[in-house]
Amino acid sequence: MKGGGKALWKDENIADSITAHAINFIRDNQNRPFFMYFATNDVHVPRFPHARFRGKNPMGYRGDAIVQFDWSVGQLMKALEEYGLADKTLIILSSDNGPVVDDGYADRAEELLNGHSPAGPFRGNKYSAFEGGTAIPVIVSWKKGVKGGRQSNVLMSQIDWLASLAQLVGARLPKGTACDSEPRLGNLLGTDSQSRLWVIEQSSSHVLSVRTPQWKFIEP
């Protein structure tokens, strides 16, 4: 790793650091369109939230990390409000996989779940081909373009976001770019309930599966 002292970090300071950088980015770009990807370390292991969040949740460090993540999102929302961008900013909150509780760190995450089921009604978790590993939550907020208070079970894939966001801003993707990304802006905005015909998925052990709106086939 290069960079000397500037390349060093403490896990408990990651949330504060990336949140501050994100707020500065919003401030510096408030007068022009921008795309910002905010990839938080919460609740990824090792889970080591800042001291001011420890003990805030009965689920131990994992719960505290979720509280810390909630704080980061709140700070970004406040920044958008402060700079007059809240009404015209499309916000997508999601995950890159299903939940994992015990990932090799002795932080008592399993013991302190207190009846909470991170994958909801689904079987499996992050590494699995079952829905618990591949079905992820998506929250979309855009005061100018999304009617709130609704839920959707429409089938789409995160790979569709590239084509969908290009569709939103009127951009044409170069030929051969993201050929498996479908423009499904209506699904994101809640104006179209037509699902994708199918999605190909793969687990960490390279097990392939095909998901349709009604069925899921996992290779034997």
Residue ranges and their predicted role:
Residues 99-129, 146-220:
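C-terminal cap/loop subdomain of S1 sulfatases and analogous C-terminal strand-loop tails that border
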Residues 9-17, 60-67, 152-159, 178:
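Soluble non-cytosolic domains of exported or imported proteins
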Residues 38-43, 48-51, 94-97, 134, ...:
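Active-site-proximal beta-strand/loop segments in catalytic clefts of secreted hydrolases
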Residues 69-106:
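Metal-dependent active-site segment of extracytoplasmic phospho-/sulfohydrolases and closely related
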Residues 29-36, 85-91, 135-136, 194-197, ...:
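Loop/turn elements at helix/coil->beta-strand transitions in domains of secreted/extracellular proteins
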Residues 22-64, 100-102, 106-109:
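Active-site His/acidic residue clusters
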